[in-house]
Amino acid sequence: SLLYGSDAMGGVIDITPAIVPLTNQFFGEAALLGKSVNGTVGGSVMLGFRKNAWFTKMRYSEQHFGDYHVPADTVIYLTQKMPLYGRKLKNTAGLERNISFFTQYHHKDYKSDYAISNVFQKNGFFPGAHGIPDISRLQDDGDSRNIELPFSQVNHLKFTTHQQYAWESILLSGDFGYQNNHREEWSAFHTHYGTQPLPEKDPDKELAFMLHTFSSSVKLRLFGSSSWEHTAGWDSQYQQNSISGYSFL
């Protein structure tokens, strides 16, 4: 925790930047993905280049999937038997869409990294195990890839930068970042309390959570000899969150 901050008291996974090619070059990669359990179709494309002091890499990935197939024709939810028409979990289709960009500048003793990424996911919930049981909502609608109520969607946006300067026996570095986590769950209004009124705004928004995180870390490392290394650092974090939805108490 002295080296990585208080959140590392239980351990840390140190994810290092991508390895920079030794020579100037342009490179790329493409991958396709398919799954039979839910008809997943997806792909990913990566492009990058090294030009003198600059190294840049970007990636875009997306996948779509349909309702999950299961080896059962019924499930029990709150003591009620719920049928699975066609042995499929209705409304469990979804999609994922991710994009990332990374660039690095390295000249002599100075190095700086900049990264931005956005991850989006939308998934349907099986209506037979969400909210008040209702067999009528389980009827096959003929479309295994549509997303209806109830569903969840999550978006995670992140900006980070790493700055570093080295002298003969001193290394000064800093990490600064911002994260935005936004999660929502939508479901037709339902309640176990007869006195709870229908919300005037977004009546079907069951849960919502928004988290803003600003973080910074500065570290000074002194290499006095081959046997000793001294480190001094400063770490700070600021968070702000908000919640909404009729299921939040």
Located regions from the model:
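Transmembrane beta-strands of outer-membrane beta-barrel proteins
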Residues: F26-A30, T56-M58, S112-Y114, I170-F176, ...
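N-terminal periplasmic accessory domains that precede
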Residues: A8-L32, V41-M46
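Flexible loop and strand-edge segments within Gram-negative outer membrane beta-barrel domains
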Residues: F65, K90-E96, Y110-A166, Y178-M210
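Short loop/turn motifs that connect adjacent beta-strands in outer-membrane beta-barrel proteins
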Residues: Y4, V20-F26, A53, D109, ...
